[in-house]
Amino acid sequence: MSHRDTLFSAPIARLGDWTFDERVAEVFPDMIQRSVPGYSNIISMIGMLAERFVQPGTQVYDLGCSLGAATLSVRRNIHHDNCKIIAIDNSPAMIERCRRHIDAYKAPTPVDVIEGDIRDIAIENASMVVLNFTLQFLEPSERQALLDKIYQGLNPGGALVLSEKFSFEDAKVGELLFNMHHDFKRANGYSELEISQKRSMLENVMLTDSVETHKARLHQAGFEHSELWFQCFNFGSLVALKAEDAA
């Protein structure tokens, strides 16, 4: 059962850096719905993309799976035999709850839920890979290597879905979308104190990139095609395609 997010409703003397611990896992569904504009749309559309890209006898990777929302969306839309989903997260609290969520929804496609570091996982025989608000928590110097590994592990014609919070090269646009995002959180019941304290905890942990930076990395990894398919304020999602004739 999910609870309402009140983690930062009272002043916290020593905030520290953000961690996906048991307290966060307990309120995560409420937190992300009230904090990330368009999150439900992204999750449902990931399922539609899976229906288009997942092929028989292949694997799907959900890297940084949290509670398994994207995994479940993919699973509901796989209509082929001999497919498998591999869902990975490095948070024990998230993985424990993810396993419960996956087990609660029976479907023919098996799911391996793994507690581990996505940087250490081999990507093999993949028709689709999902990075749903995950890359932004890696050190910027480590992001290209992960995208390179994903590209190498994707089969020709495969797809990567990359959802992120964005920064903007145009400072005026960045300020507008930043403020609109804060308006969104206020409209969803978060106080100024809650918004401020959460931002302080995240600022050294979640380091955002521009869409242009993401596209440049994807191109360097080998993806011939990439485009922003969804955006709401400073949050969005790209899809990157490996050519069908790729070696």
UniProtKB/Swiss-Prot annotation:
GO terms for molecular function: carboxyl- or carbamoyltransferase activity; S-adenosyl-L-methionine binding. It catalyses: prephenate + S-adenosyl-L-methionine = carboxy-S-adenosyl-L-methionine + 3-phenylpyruvate + H2O. Pfam families: Methyltransf_25. The keyword Thylakoid does not apply. Its EC number is 2.1.3.-. It comes from the Bacteria. S-adenosyl-L-methionine binds at Y39, G64, C65, S66, D89, N90, D117, I118, N132, R199. CDD domains: AdoMet_MTases. Keywords: S-adenosyl-L-methionine, Transferase. The keyword S-adenosyl-L-methionine applies. It is an enzyme of class 2 (transferase). GO terms for biological process: tRNA wobble uridine modification. InterPro entries: CmoA (IPR005271), Methyltransf_25 (IPR041698), SAM-dependent_MTases_sf (IPR029063). Belongs to the class I-like SAM-binding methyltransferase superfamily. Cx-SAM synthase family. Catalyzes the conversion of S-adenosyl-L-methionine (SAM) to carboxy-S-adenosyl-L-methionine (Cx-SAM). Homodimer. This is Carboxy-S-adenosyl-L-methionine synthase. It comes from Escherichia fergusonii (strain ATCC 35469 / DSM 13698 / CCUG 18766 / IAM 14443 / JCM 21226 / LMG 7866 / NBRC 102419 / NCTC 12128 / CDC 0568-73). The gene is cmoA.
